[in-house]
C-alpha cells in the first residue's frame, strides 16, 4: 500500500517457519519468533549484528515439538554443543 507521497507503508512481509519452512500466515497467532544474541562478557550488553533469529509456526507448537525444533536449529548453527555420546 502507498500513501499520498508515494511511500510504501504497512507492507506485510511473510515469515517462514525455521523448522518446517511453512509460511507463517498473518492469522497464525500461535507462532513465536525468538532471537538469540551474543553478549559482551565485560559490559553485559548485546553485540550489534550478532544475533540468530528463529521463527516457529503454530502447527509445530501445537504438536509440542517447538523445544526440540529450537534445540536442533541451535545445534546446527553452533549455539548449543551437540551431544555426541556413543552408547555401548
Swiss-Prot record:
Task: Write out the GO biological process terms.
Answer: endonucleolytic cleavage in ITS1 to separate SSU-rRNA from 5.8S rRNA and LSU-rRNA from tricistronic rRNA transcript (SSU-rRNA, 5.8S rRNA, LSU-rRNA); endonucleolytic cleavage to generate mature 3'-end of SSU-rRNA from (SSU-rRNA, 5.8S rRNA, LSU-rRNA); translation
Q: Name one GO cellular component term.
A: cytosolic small ribosomal subunit
Q: Which InterPro entries match?
A: Ribosomal_eS21 (IPR001931), Ribosomal_eS21_CS (IPR018279), Ribosomal_eS21_sf (IPR038579)
Give the matching Gene3D superfamilies: 3.30.1230.20
Protein location: Cytoplasm, Cytosol; Cytoplasm; Rough endoplasmic reticulum
- Which GO-annotated molecular functions does the record name? structural constituent of ribosome
**Key word Oxidoreductase present in the record?**
no
Q: Endoplasmic reticulum among the record's keywords?
A: yes
Q: Which UniProt keywords apply?
A: Cytoplasm, Endoplasmic reticulum, Ribonucleoprotein, Ribosomal protein
What is the protein's major site of localization? Answer: cytoplasm
| Assembly | Component of the 40S small ribosomal subunit.
Which family does the similarity line name?
A: Belongs to the eukaryotic ribosomal protein eS21 family.
Official protein name in the record? Small ribosomal subunit protein eS21
What organism is listed for this UniProt entry? Caenorhabditis elegans
Amino acid at each position: 500500500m502507498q500513501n499520498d507521497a508515494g511511500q510504501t507503508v504497512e507492507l506485510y512481509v511473510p515469515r517462514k517457519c525455521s523448522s518446517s519452512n511453512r509460511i507463517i500466515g498473518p492469522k497464525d497467532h500461535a507462532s513465536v519468533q525468538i532471537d538469540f544474541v551474543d553478549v559482551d562478557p565485560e559490559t553485559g550488553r548485546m553485540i550489534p549484528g550478532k544475533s540468530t533469529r528463529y521463527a516457529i509456526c503454530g502447527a509445530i507448537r501445537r504438536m509440542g515439538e517447538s523445544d526440540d525444533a529450537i534445540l536442533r536449529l541451535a545445534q546446527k548453527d553452533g549455539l548449543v554443543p551437540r551431544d555426541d555420546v556413543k552408547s555401548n
